[in-house]
Amino acid sequence: MSNYNVALVGDFNVSVIAHNAVPQALRLTGIDITPVWFHTSAISDPESQFADFDGIWCVPASPYANTEGALSAIRYARERGRPFLGTCGGFQHALLEYARNVCGLHQAANAETDPGAALRLIAPLACSLIEKSDDMLLTDGLLGQAYGQSRITEGYHCSYGLNRDYEALLFSGDLRVTARDLAGEVRGVELSGHPFFAATLFQPERRALRGETPPLVAAFVSALAA
């Protein structure tokens, strides 16, 4: 059986629920995976640092110590066709990376770290989703295929999401929405033409804490061997 290396991009903290769930989620897939944590402050040369990794998972718990480090890891995965999963903070930063480097929105910012920014792509949610669960509707795509259904319930730990004012600009190309909550807010995206590039504001890895294999994580792992 093959072994796959997965880079976990994020600043590990044992007190963060999702950080305990992520390795468990990978183990529950039944595939031999070696996860390696990358503190964002240590990311300086993605081309060499991630060359031997089969996939990259940008994990929750942001703001990160080094925003640019996280963004460079995401860009590497996007441009090099490496399977990529972003959850919670990883979702926010996947949107930032795409906005800046593909859409030309070079000033795109996260209001959590730059509340006075002119272009607040990531903005406060109307209602905080700290330790809450919510329903979402899935469209055809990676998420819908992974879950095998059009409506799901997943857990969150966040207060910031996509500013709806920028949806038209952000989703005019290959990046598309594949999950929305019942109010129509974006909760999941994927990149067309990429082997596997998916990001969700929710934290699918939390299912592992109940002994369940998270469907989206299983799909990500399957892409490692494709």
Predicted regions and their residues:
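N-terminal beta1-alpha1 cap of cysteine-dependent amidohydrolase-like domains
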Residues: 1-151, 156-174, 178-193, 201-226
